[in-house]
Curated annotation (Swiss-Prot):
The keyword Protease does not apply. Its cofactor is Mg(2+). Catalyzes the cleavage of citrate into oxaloacetate and acetyl-CoA, the latter serving as common substrate in multiple biochemical reactions in protein, carbohydrate and lipid metabolism. The modification Phosphothreonine is found at residues 447, 639. The modification N6-acetyllysine is found at residues 540, 546, 554, 948, 968, 978, 1077. It comes from Ovis aries. This is ATP-citrate synthase.
């Protein structure tokens, strides 16, 4: 959603902070909020003026006409305010059809004034600009301001100056107040623009001799501008409309939505309701709600929501478990229904999202059975067969009744089944597997089809009979612009269209190339890509079986210069970059069409794009769209889904039906419906779900009217806006003569007691004429073919098509099979069609899922269990969860081996490298490369040597004598500095810990007996730290209970123990590197006097 209402308190706080005007605004920041939890003593301490002034009190919960409802207390003392609040605060009230609790009130100073000092001011956004309304008689009885007020349109990118205000708005205002009003309205408009408001109303605005008072205020801001206005807005709150509570679950889903690139929405309508929905797609979610309400389920509909934009399995799981948790809290005598619906996805992996839902169903299978929940599923899109399979499987394994349907079933048919209006088929038709389409594309003969390169009736000149006409039922203000109806160029795309793709969207580009290939285009439609975050290079793609290279440019200018044949740009930039990149694109005259995919571009910026596009003669599709498709010619990005859907919906060749919709998912559903009921799609465009799409329904309908190959037009309209009325006008005035089938979704909105913002930003009616019901009625009366519901849309399309065929306007042609396109390896593997031995294997770590996993343990569990470094090392090195004492011992080993001064070879090398100006990694590596048999490598050797002696059964004295006889050193014995008289405290600390905590220490005991023998000969032949760690580690591996004897011996043999020294000493080496850098030590050169130069005598003579 884009425009969101804010509370009066928030609106005034922002206005008082940021408005710039010469008018003296009084009572700045004088307001106090009261809730049922308010501490009055604290309130009086924070707002002492409450005791000294007369007061006004009113609810601040987005309630209109509070004065007429008796919800404003005027000219009261503080005690009077308390008395007035007593029967109201926390109590239930009914406002229109909505019933809710009054729990948020605003107290302000009372302003004595006369009726003549009250004025009305309102600013609101439209496509063309911002309207400023002013009426010289404000207050409770202002009446119909649209009819009475002075109105001034400030066009996009234009400024409002005080002289225009005086001339056009303050015509009837008192002369002595014109100056102050003009200054205030000018400042108010600048404030409105700067903080991205979409609606701002002050009634009354009171102007007295003391200055300006803002008594009542209502406002909406563009929530998508948060990234621009965050500093000024702060943490702004968006309260729910009166009559609907704010639930923590809604806030949780909103938080998930904010953290995700996908779209996740949830609105609770009736938590005790019987019918729950979990629908994929903004448009589809509205259609399902419509159908439920049409079939009499409005009072039982529990929620509205949608998920779209390819959420991950984990995100879908979180969304699903929230809904399942809500619906299993209260029982219903008739059981409950969960509708998991959706249109045909364009790029969302249905199997991945369904696996998240399946996880949630498994987690809640007990409560679901207890509450007698029946689930109905219908979905299509990439890998949907696998998604439906796992959904059906979970029904069998859990015993929950789950009815599963695919694209062979009409999208909303499951609603009728769920509510008992139509039978549930025992065995629905089985859709072909994804791979079947690709391996045998010509197998389906369900629809007669033409060649791939021409429409059925491209060459026919017969004009279609005009649609039947009737008197239009349009409100006078429904068509704001009186300009004549004119279309832009009728052809946006052809078989030779070339495009540049902005963004590293390799999957979308490959999809476009596969579409081009299956349409038998001569060349790929993507000429180049632009991506500012890399240097110029080439990206590899497939053209059928052949690999090709597509250039990627860092700068758009280079791409345009080297590809002058390009006239389309597909913009995949993020919502933060989409505006700037689109503005830059329009500087190049070669570009005639731009598709903006991003959702969430602020409306004010979109209007600037529209204005510049009109000046440049550029057609914009979007924002917030999947794009469009012209079968046999060109497709934008992910439109039409993957190849299986392209082939199933016959999108590889043109038909005779053109459509335009707002929703990307619903456009794919139209592809499916049209392919099943007619000869197929000629062209289809999804203009996007924002309130101000770059191109409108009428722009494309007029193109279709002027395109000979299009014989009938389908429009899927939507609640919000008045664009559909232009179609009515076009039909009645004879500008549109081809048959038009139209249905506006969102009819359910009129049945809800409180306002619901649907999935698309523009799907909200701001006046009666913007409702879907009003628009459908007007279209019907204008002579457009309007079904009774979306359920009947396919039947109406088929009826109109068959009539055109019967009259010879359309002549179906023979199908020509498309070429076979190979399947990508990655997708074939995803579908389970192929297998290949992996080049690498790993068993310690998995980063592919929602969270990192160490040897089977999620990272969250690692921290929850406080496993520490020792525990993590146990997981990654040994794939075992070690006992607590073992983890502690490992950490102690790392501590005692961390460093042993700068004189040892490894530290010395590190210091030399650091002083030579080398980087951290180079310096560390030079130190590590000295580790071997002479330095630090004794851990493994000592462990092996002592283990072999102990396991062979020879006594310590025999072992010492044997090593002496063989002339070998005993590894782990001896120290240059430490001796039995000067013990190494590191050894002592570890030895005491091991003896105290280890269950058994036979090898350590053996080594200590050896030490007694060696020190008796020479005091420095002690068991050193390497030797102690080596033998103690063997004891730990053998006796901690986590390893078999074979596993313990294997870890010793493969050199695991030397890893302890390497890991520990790395900390010290890094310390030495940082120390030298911090001390700013220069290049080291060894002094001559410390080098003995020994040269051959004959060379020195």
């Amino acid at each position: 959603m884009s425009a969101k209402a804010i509370s009066e308190q928030t609106g005034k706080e922002l206005l008082y902070k940021y408005i710039c005007t010469t008018s003296a605004i009084q009572n700045r920041f004088k307001y106090a909020r009261v809730t049922p939890d308010t501490d009055w003593a604290r309130l009086l301490q924070d707002h002492p003026w409450l005791l000294s002034q007369s007061l006004v009190v009113k609810p601040d919960q987005l309630i209109k006409r509070r004065g007429k409802l008796g919800l404003v207390g005027v000219n009261l003392t503080l005690d009077g305010v308390k008395s007035w609040l007593k029967p109201r605060l926390g109590q239930e009230a009914t406002v229109g059809k909505a019933t809710g609790f009054l729990k948020n009130f605003l107290i302000e100073p009372f302003v004595p004034h006369t009726q003549e000092e009250e004025f009305y001011v309102c600013i609101y956004a439209t496509r063309e600009g911002d309207y400023v309304l002013f009426h010289h008689e404000g207050g409770v009885d202002v009446g119909d301001v649209d009819a009475k007020a002075q109105k001034l349109l400030v066009a996009v990118d234009e400024k409002l100056n005080p002289e225009d205000i005086k001339k056009h708005l303050l015509v009837h205002a008192p002369e002595d107040k014109k100056e102050i009003l003009a200054s205030f309205i000018s400042g108010l408009f600048n404030f409105y623009e700067d903080l991205y408001f979409t609606y701002l109303e002050i009634n009354p605005l009171v102007v007295t001799k003391d200055g300006v008072y803002i008594l009542d205020l209502a406002a909406k801001v563009d929530a998508t501008a948060d990234y621009i206005c965050k500093v000024k807005w702060g943490d702004i709150e968006f309260p729910p409309p009166f009559g609907r509570e704010a639930y923590p679950e809604e806030a949780y889903i909103a938080d998930l939505d904010a953290k995700s690139g996908a779209s996740l929405k949830l609105t609770l309508l009736n938590p005790k309701g019987r019918i729950w929905t979990m629908v994929a797609g903004g448009g589809a979610s509205v259609v399902y709600s419509d159908t439920i309400c049409d079939l009499g389920g409005v009072n039982e509909l529990a929620n509205y929501g949608e998920y779209s934009g390819a959420p991950s399995e984990q995100q879908t799981y979180d969304y699903a478990k929230t809904i399942l948790s809500l619906m299993t809290r209260e029982k219903h005598p008739d059981g409950k229904i969960l509708i998991i619906g959706g249109s045909i996805a364009n790029f969302t992996n249905v199997a991945a999202t369904f696996k998240g839902i399946v996880r949630a169903i498994r987690d809640y299978q007990g409560p679901l059975k207890e509450h007698e929940v029946t689930i109905f599923v219908r979905r299509g899109g990439p890998n949907y067969q696998e998604g439906l399979r796992v959904m059906g499987e979970v029904g069998k394994t859990t015993g929950i009744p789950i009815h599963v349907f695919g694209t062979e079933t009409h999208m909303t048919a499951i609603v009728g089944m769920a509510l008992g209006h139509r039978p549930i088929p025992n065995q629905p038709p089985t859709a072909a597997h994804t791979a079947n389409f690709l391996l045998n594309a010509s197998g389906s003969t369900s629809t007669p089809a033409p060649s791939r390169t021409a429409s059925f009736s491209e060459s026919r000149t017969d004009e279609v009979a005009p649609a039947k006409k009737a008197k239009p039922a349009m409100p006078q203000d429904s068509v704001p612009s009186p300009r004549p109806l004119q279309g832009k160029s009728a052809t946006l795309f052809s078989r030779h269209t070339k495009a540049i793709v902005w963004g590293m969207q390799t999957r979308a580009v490959q999809g476009m190339l596969d579409f081009d290939y299956v349409c038998s285009r001569d060349e790929p439609s993507v000429a180049a890509m632009v991506y500012p975050f890399t240097g110029d290079h080439k990206q590899k793609f497939y053209w059928g079986h052949k690999e090709i290279l597509i250039p990627v440019f860092k700068n758009m200018a280079d791409a345009m210069k080297k590809h002058p044949e390009v006239d389309v740009l597909i913009n995949f930039a993020s919502l933060r970059s989409a505006y700037d990149s689109t503005m830059e694109t329009m500087n190049y005259t070669q570009i005639r069409t731009i598709a903006i995919i991003a959702e969430g571009i602020p409306e004010a910026l979109t209007r600037k794009l529209i204005k510049k596009a009109e000046q440049k003669g550029v057609t914009i599709i979007g924002p917030a769209t999947v794009g469009g498709i012209k079968p046999g010619c060109f497709k934008i990005g992910n439109t039409g889904g993957m190849l299986d859907n392209i082939l199933a919906s016959k999108l590889y060749r043109p038909g005779s039906v053109a459509y335009v919709s707002r929703s990307g998912g619903m456009s794919n559903e139209l592809n499916n419906i049209i392919s099943r009921t007619t000869d197929g799609v000629y062209e289809g465009v999804a203009i996007g779900g924002d309130r101000y799409p770059g191109s409108t329904f009428m722009d494309h309908v007029l193109r279709y009217q002027d395109t000979p190959g299009v014989k009938m037009i389908v429009v899927l309209g939507e609640i919000g806006g008045t664009e559909e009325y232009k179609i009515c006008r076009g039909v009645t005035e004879g500008r549109i003569t081809k048959p038009v089938v139209c249905w506006c979704i969102g009819t359910c909105a009129a049945m809800f007691s409180s306002e619901v913002q649907f999935g698309h930003a523009g799907a909200c009616a701001n006046q009666a004429s913007e409702t879907a019901v009003a628009k459908n009625q007007a279209l019907k009366e204008a002579g457009v073919f309007v079904p009774r519901s979306f359920d009947e849309l396919g039947e109406i399309i088929q009826s109109v098509y068959e009539d055109l065929v019967a009259r010879g306007v359309i002549v179906p042609a023979q199908e020509v099979p498309p070429p076979t396109v190979p399947m990508d390896y990655s997708w074939a593997r995803e579908l389970g069609l192929i297998r290949k031995p992996a080049s690498f294997m790993t068993s310690i770590c998995d980063e592919r899922g929602q969270e990192l996993i160490y040897a089977g343990m999620p990272i969250t569990e690692v921290f929850k269990e406080e496993m520490g470094i020792g525990g993590v090392l146990g997981l990654l090195w040994f794939q075992k969860r070690l006992p607590k004492y073992s983890c502690q011992f490992i950490e102690m080993c790392l501590m005692v081996t961390a460093d042993h001064g700068p004189a040892v070879s490894g530290a010395h090398n590190t210091i030399i490298c650091a002083r030579a100006g080398k980087d951290l990694v180079s310096s560390l590596t030079s130190g590590l490369l000295t580790i071997g048999d002479r330095f630090g490598g004794a851990l493994d050797a000592a462990a092996k040597m002592f283990s072999k002696a102990f396991d062979s059964g020879i006594i310590p004295m025999e072992f010492v004598n044997k090593m002496k006889k063989e002339g070998k050193l005993i590894m782990g014995i001896g120290h240059r500095v430490k001796s039995i008289n000067n013990p190494d405290m590191r050894v002592q600390i570890l030895k005491d810990y091991v003896r105290q905590h280890f269950p058994a220490t036979p090898l350590l005991d053996y080594a200590l007996e050896v030490e007694k023998i060696t020190t008796s000969k020479k005091p420095n032949l002690i068991l050193n730290v390497d030797g102690l760690i080596g033998v103690a580690f063997v004891d730990m591996l053998r006796h901690c209970g986590s390893f078999t004897r074979e596993e313990a011996d294997e870890y010793i043999d493969i050199g695991a123990l030397n890893g302890i020294f390497v890991l520990g000493r790395s900390m010290g080496f890094i310390g030495h590197y940082l120390d030298q850098k911090r001390l700013k030590q220069g290049l080291y050169r060894h002094p001559w006097d410390d080098i003995s130069y020994v040269l051959p005598e004959h060379m020195s003579m």
